[in-house]
């Protein structure tokens, strides 16, 4: 007769530990817990990738709003920054737009000058 032994118990214990906090049978029954943990890990993997897209979209929205307050659209602002040789990423630009409006306004002016010169 085959004995499943400690490794099987260890695996089940690990799955049930990962399922802690789930509702109903999903944290008590090994079969349901295993299925839910598998889905949860897939969702976590997918959403780690998605989070990067969402943050970039948020940064672009913030930059666009601040640039429009200073008389430029987002695309014109980014184009002006590239032409003037300023290489700041969108995360830093969005932070400046929210926390340091004076510095951001100076960047917009620099971008405007670069657009007019070109």
From Swiss-Prot:
GO molecular function: rRNA binding; structural constituent of ribosome
Biological process according to GO: ribosomal large subunit assembly; translation
Keyword flag Magnesium: no
GO cellular component terms, A-Z: ribonucleoprotein complex; ribosome
Entry-linked Pfam families: Ribosomal_L20 (PF00453)
Signal sequence residues: none
Keyword vocabulary terms for this entry: Ribonucleoprotein, Ribosomal protein, RNA-binding, rRNA-binding
SUPFAM superfamilies, per database record: Ribosomal protein L20
Biological role: Binds directly to 23S ribosomal RNA and is necessary for the in vitro assembly process of the 50S ribosomal subunit. It is not involved in the protein synthesizing functions of that subunit.
NCBIfam families referenced in this protein's UniProt entry, alphabetically: rplT_bact
Family, similarity comment: Belongs to the bacterial ribosomal protein bL20 family.
Protein's name according to its UniProt entry: Large ribosomal subunit protein bL20
The organism of origin for this protein: Sulfurihydrogenibium sp. (strain YO3AOP1)
Source species taxonomy: Bacteria, Pseudomonadati, Aquificota, Aquificia, Aquificales
């Amino acid at each position: 007769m085959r004995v499943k032994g400690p490794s099987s118990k260890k695996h089940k214990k690990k799955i049930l530990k990962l399922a802690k906090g789930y509702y109903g049978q999903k944290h008590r029954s090994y079969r349901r817990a295993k299925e839910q943990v598998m889905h949860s890990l897939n969702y976590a993997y997918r959403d780690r990738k998605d989070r990067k897209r969402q943050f970039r979209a948020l940064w672009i929205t913030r930059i666009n709003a601040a640039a429009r307050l200073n008389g430029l659209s987002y695309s014109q602002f980014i184009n002006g920054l590239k032409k003037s040789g300023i290489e700041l990423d969108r995360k830093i630009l969005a932070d400046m737009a929210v926390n340091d409006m004076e510095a951001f306004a100076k960047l917009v002016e620099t971008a405007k000058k670069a657009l007019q010169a070109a």
